[in-house]
Amino acid sequence: MDADKITEKLGITMSQMQRAAAAAIIQGSGNVEVLSPTGSGKTLAYLLPLAQLIDAKSDELQAVVIVPGRELAIQSAEVLASLKAGVRGYACHGGRSAMDEHRELRKLMPHVVFATPGRLNDHLDKANIDPSGVRWTVIDEFDKCLQMGFADEMNHAMERMPKTARRIFLSATNMADDGRANGELSPVGFHIVDFLENSDDHKDRVKINIVNSPDKDKLRTLANLLACLGDESTIVFLNYRDSVERTADFLRSEGFSLTAYHGGLDQSQREEAIYRFANGSANILISTNLGSRGLDIPNVRNIVHYHLPETEEDYTHRVGRTARWDKTGKTYFILSEGETLPDYVDATTCDFEFPENLPKPAKSRMTTLYIGKGKKDKVSKGDILGFLCKTGGLKGAEIGRIDVYDYYAYAAVDNRKLNFVLKNVQGCKIKGKRTKVEEMR
């Protein structure tokens, strides 16, 4: 399907960078490197042209996308599915059985595989993935992949791809002079789509606020700030896992709607945390820097630096979570006595002033329902939407994101209607099958 038709159907307006990248991939015949700031939409920049170029009638694997983490693999597969172009995608990553993935790969026969380096090599070693028909090999977040030490694994995987396959690297940093970008990872001779100089445009769309804390322990100042931000979607960044848990526990005790995210959680816990934040069931995400890369969550209004970022790169990727796709956003530095703004924050700042009467913590706009039937039960998004409207008594505007998995589904509903809808659907059937419906805990 033509990329322009896909965007028109979905109501998407491609940015200048995305158009330039798409043109280089569709019209060119060589390798392409896309350099563009965090939050500028690089995932769509390569998926839209691939959706046009891939032969959806074939059952061959035609593209392999290497990503640095499981969250980006999952999200990228979801983005491809949302394009509704008939192109099948599948995410392969650690944290689950490779044997289960092999069964799914054989059944689905994806056109595109999104994979972390280690899991990709595992499947290649076991011949679970046949790369012979691959026409495109993509490395998304190329800079982060190198920084995380995946160079050897990526080189090994790339060596096993057909020599005729075109290569597409996407990065928020120019890694041409990085010694790790060698061998199969060298971008020498690539057509460069460089929009890094436009990063100042993103800075102009982010307002920087200084929040002074009278205490070294900033928890009370943070709580007061979040109360002022109301139900706006906000990410609070800290540098340590223990600090995330401590902060989350305190804010929950204060009545805030939040979820916590860090590398110490297992895969299902991390996925649930991001899901609740993305669908509006939690206003606040408390996160380590793990949440500053690989997460594409629209409409994040505020970034709060509870701990100062340790490097300029950390700062860039934190702030890149807001003001995405030409939107505006705000970032807040909470500074205790003796702390100063890092030198690399060179924009104009404002001092945040608290009102005399602080508002109470805002409730979340949405709540997530767990529905105990899924794809294996022949239940679709449309079935769930109809069930919640006809049986649950909800209006369409009171229902948010719906996601259907193999054996269950999630649906976001207006928080004010939670008890109403649960009462209406208890004991009722969906597509003739009695099912459990309850609030996600």
List PLM regions with ranges.
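Non-catalytic terminal extensions of ATP-dependent helicases
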Residues: 34, 253, 354-441
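Conserved pre-motif I regulatory segment
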Residues: 1-35
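Conserved interdomain hinge at the start of the Helicase C-terminal
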Residues: 204-250, 393, 397
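Conserved nucleic-acid-binding Ia/Ib motif block in the N-terminal RecA-like helicase ATPase lobe
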Residues: 2-5, 59-125, 133-136, 249-261, ...
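A short beta-strand element within the Helicase C-terminal
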Residues: 133, 284, 293-308, 330-334
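Conserved segment of the helicase C-terminal RecA-like domain
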Residues: 284, 311-353
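Walker A/P-loop NTP-binding motif
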Residues: 19-30, 43-58, 74, 79-83
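Post-DEXD/H (motif II) to motif III coupling segment of the RecA-like Helicase ATP-binding lobe
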Residues: 129-199, 344-346
